[in-house]
């Protein structure tokens, strides 16, 4: 009797239907991309293929960066802001009390704590060029339970 080995098959949907892992991005990450800061290529490499999330304060923060650049005569900031607005980033409402508690716990600004809070809520990694926020995220996200 001859026993044949079964063939293993995997059927996959087209790429646009595949789940993209979530990633919380802060203003430093987005600014690096859209204003072509020296670290933009690193930021792009880290976020490609990810589903991007941010607290809704991101809009005001990126607008603030653009305004500062425009006041310094950096006219390219207008295009960068338009690019930021056009990006697919899921914006989330904050839990102000939870954000304030994280800000106190890790000695962060409320703005930075908002990104940390969202990463914890989504159980997702946080992308930032801010060393203090990154360290708080390393500590806090490691304490989360599945």
Model-predicted segments: where are they?
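Acidic, PIN/NYN-like endoribonuclease modules and their adjacent C-terminal/linker elements
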Residues: 1-22, 54-55, 116-146
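Alpha-helix capping/helix-boundary segments
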Residues: 29-30, 58, 98, 115, ...
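Acidic catalytic patch
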Residues: 79-106, 117
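Residue-level detector of anion-binding/catalytic polar loops
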Residues: 90, 109, 123-125
